[in-house]
Amino acid sequence: NNSIFDIDFSLLINDSEIPINIEGSIPINKSDKLDLRLIGNGKFIELIDIFADEYFTFKKGEVNLRMLIKGSLNKPILNGFIVIKDSEIDFYNNIIKDINSLIIFDFDSLEIKNLEAKVEDSGDVFIRGALPFYSKNDSGESEIKMITSKFSLKTDNTDFLIDSEID
């Protein structure tokens, strides 16, 4: 079966004038090739906010997404980026602010370029490194470095204080 599903989809969230765009083709056969383009232009984070219910709320800032999705449905290959600038979120009633990062999807791995954030009335976190999407990747890179200083996350039942350097 060589059928494909052609898609050209734009989604407007709430009163937004900027859509989330998805266009390309999705094969019916899972081993055939994908060809999708996803452009978030700051609005895809609002979609995540809607689906995450009360556990995650995007408060402010800029989050932009551009993504090419190739490969197959069984093993997609992602090429693109997420840029986060001066953002703030509420995660389980913890305000995490001053979030800045560049996240690169480089075919078979994810690279985090200097993600920095602060917890309101608490410490900060810094994350950098790369992880493969699959257990084996061509680049060979698979290391994440996380440095936290008095980074506190609280929920109704827990209070985590993380002060560490993890390689």
Question: How should each PLM-predicted stretch be described?
Answer:
Residues 1-66, 74-166:
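Interface amphipathic segments
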